[in-house]
């Protein structure tokens, strides 16, 4: 599943300032972003690549030529954990902005200079931190306390792996 971050949905975004189209495709069996010239239809280049996938576009800064997106399967560990990345539209320089090995939910400030990063795993309760636009942690906003749950006898789930037939 891919979320273009646009109300109309779809697997593409038009970049009006550069007359380009950003297109999501699984042409190599992995979900990645490609940049096309909107006038000629010529592929200008891949924006992302590798054995992982882009899941959701969060924002595009056409002036800076940068794109923020959620991806999964790139970092070691659980391939379903979602991380926030930033990538250059022209150079493909990829930066991981949420390094903790967990599933991340992101909320940007109106200025986009900061974002809240709420992350957790099936066995680790949610933590919310404030990060600057480059992903540096500024402060912990909240840590979920599950001590009352544990004291009542509740047990954490036990992760397991099952080998697939294929």
Predicted regions: what they are:
Residues 1-3, 7-13, 56-64, 93-166:
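Non-catalytic accessory segments flanking enzyme active sites
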Residues 31-33, 42, 80-84, 92, ...:
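Repetitive beta-architecture junctions, highlighting loop-to-beta-strand starts
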Residues 42-49, 92-99:
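Blade-edge beta-strand/turn elements of extracellular beta-propeller
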Residues 12-28, 37, 47-48, 61, ...:
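Beta-strand C-termini and the immediately following turn/loop, strongest in propeller blades
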Residues 78-80, 153:
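Short glycine/proline-enriched turns and hinge-like loops at secondary-structure junctions
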Residues 37-40, 51, 101, 164-166:
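Short, flexible loop/turn elements at secondary-structure junctions
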Residues 38-41, 88-92, 132-134:
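Short loop/turn segments that connect beta-strands within beta-propeller blades
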């Amino acid at each position: 599943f891919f979320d273009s971050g646009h109300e109309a949905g779809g697997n593409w975004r038009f970049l009006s300032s550069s007359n380009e189209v950003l297109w999501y495709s699984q042409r190599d069996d992995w979900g990645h972003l490609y940049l096309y010239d909107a006038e000629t239809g010529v592929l200008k280049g891949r924006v992302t690549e590798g054995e992982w996938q882009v899941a959701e576009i969060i924002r595009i800064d056409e002036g800076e030529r940068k794109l923020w997106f959620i991806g999964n399967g790139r970092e070691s560990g659980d391939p379903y954990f979602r991380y926030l990345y930033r990538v250059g539209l022209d150079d493909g320089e990829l930066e991981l902005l949420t390094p903790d090995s967990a599933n991340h939910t992101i909320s940007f400030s109106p200025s986009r200079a900061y974002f809240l990063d709420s992350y957790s795993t099936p066995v680790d309760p949610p933590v919310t931190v404030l990060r600057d636009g480059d992903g540096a942690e500024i402060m912990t906003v909240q840590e979920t306390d599950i001590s009352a749950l544990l004291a009542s006898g509740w047990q954490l789930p036990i992760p397991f792996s099952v080998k697939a037939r294929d």
